Amino acid sequence: TYGTSRINAYKIIEETLNLKDVRIFDYIEDDEGKRKAVLNKKETAIAQAKQELIKQGFQDWVWADPERREKLTRLYNEKFNSIRPREYDGSHIIFSGMNPEITLREHQRNAVAHILYGGNTLLAHAVGAGKTFEMVAASQELKRLGLCNKSLFVVPNHLTEQWAAEYLQLYPSANILVATKKDFETKNRKRFCGRIATGDYDAVIIGHSQFEKIPMSIERQRAILEQQIEELTRGIAELKANRGERFSIKQLERSKKSVTQKLAKLNDQSRKDDVVTFEELGVDRLFIDESHYYKNLYLYTKMRNVGGIAQTEAQKSSDLFMKCRYLDEITGGRG
């Protein structure tokens, strides 16, 4: 009833429990005599229809018994449905040093409170809601309260000057450092990074591409790459032990090879003692404008065909990830 001529019901149930869509492959030899897997769309469609029947059958069975239904509902609510997102109230915040001609709206004050008290924060307001002022006000309050030493704002390259103007519009007496295109030319980069590291600035504003030119220390990069290799090695071993699809195993092996090559390249680099690393800047708060530019970060998962989960990785995304991990370490998840 729940199997096909190409795959039995037990295997379909196993794939379903592992959050995988069933796929049926035929194997052919290419011109070089290598065995190649080709998706059989017809058999896959039949198998996936059986998979949906199993899911629906399980769902019908779960809810058929009133006692079981009540018990499972209670367990689910106690374990997963008992957390209510915290609401933040910023009505009490004074905003010392803010331009008296400007008054933040209620949602902006609450967003600042969220940043102050809630740790890592995503500002997902609509365009025009005032996210720039929210970040600027939060940065100044963090500094005033002694909760941060120096904030770094990473914004689209063409908006650095606009950001600086809006920052000073909201806080006219703020001491900020703004990067220009010349500051990150090879001959000037070390001097500018030195200014960031030694200056007592309220905030530093740089462009996305400039941010990528400030490296993490080789030791930290190596540790993170080694951790990724370890995760991929475990994933490959698990798939082989469970007789996972050859395609999935090859995909992980390609990812492992790519990360291993990155590690080898990193180990071959000659250390440049005159390079100022990100850790040496003294930055302990990071504000990213237009953060959706940093997508396609590799994530190991058993799930397949999930929108938004990339199997390849953008260099700028992995660079930001490393820097965020470092800031979380030194701030307790508030970087």
Predicted regions mapped to residue ranges:
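Secondary-structure boundary/capping positions in well-ordered alpha/beta enzyme cores
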Residues: I83, G118, L122, N149, ...
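Conserved helicase ATPase motor motifs in RecA-like P-loop NTPase domains
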Residues: V127-G128, E290-H292, G332-G335
